[in-house]
């Protein structure tokens, strides 16, 4: 009897151990499946003045480079101001208005179609549609890459007017004779790009993930383009928050990391889309108006001193004017006159007796000094843009000032030209050395101070 009981206990123990082992295996999914990393799509960003840019001129002087940049920033501000107030009235209400041709700051290179055809696009957070020039051309401008021919792509599809992705327009002209969805992009200088809305396969080539395809991306195939750009780029990569934007297609998250824009050999600027976008850092609320990105700027400091500026001058009014836009298409930042007067007065007070004031021929209203930033601004305090949520966007001396000549530099925060301007803009110099990430679904922007090279692995 005792032997039988002992045998029963032994068998029960074996059964328990086998069952426990099976449960442990079942409870550990890592032993039966591989965790899938969130997908991300990465492309290098090429600055207009980079050695990798088709616009690069090794013989250009500092004055040539900065003169273009300042004129471009002024043109871009005019565009943002008009877009922020919805000031454009066009026959085609689907049409966005993109900045004039001089305002190409960053470009991205990826491929369209199957087989893939490389295209170079200007990045723009202030417009929504991704578009490229397409054959056959009624009119096309010069570009560095071959013009995309949709007839040679096995993955190109036009969109019918009834498609949810067809941009809303007036019933009279949203369709062509074949019931395909049309688009029209108008420019500040009166030129335009027009064609069909379609879908196509895009291919990103990344150093860490190889070739990453995106199927059925909505884009504009532009066949009729009147002097839109004076030659190199293929079109525009709109990163605005609309339903047809590539950002929405890839999960409503994207980020860009910008290092030194004045180092022509800096190779680590990059743009990332998708759920695998690096979303880290200090967080501030994001507001969307007229398909521009607005932040809540609460104040400005110079060094440890909070400047006496009324925060109301940075906020958007109930009538839809003013506010603070964050943008990638302007090099400089702009603040309204009352804020600029306080900031420039404080800079002058610190520089008085140390730096020699000079007048810049291109921007006579700018605050400029004789000397070099590295030599003459040793120990000069940086500035901080204080954003809602406790986020401090720090501008060191290379972001607060811009080299404008062989022996001259100017304050890179300026006031808009014209009386009564109430829009503020945070430009790309202020975003140097940050990874700036947008989560459109959560309506948040993340700022992480980082060396962009660290994001490549």
Predicted regions and their residues:
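Conserved catalytic motifs of the protein kinase core domain
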Residues: 118, 232, 321
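Intrinsically disordered, low-complexity regions enriched in proline, serine, glycine
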Residues: 132-133, 141-143, 248, 336, ...
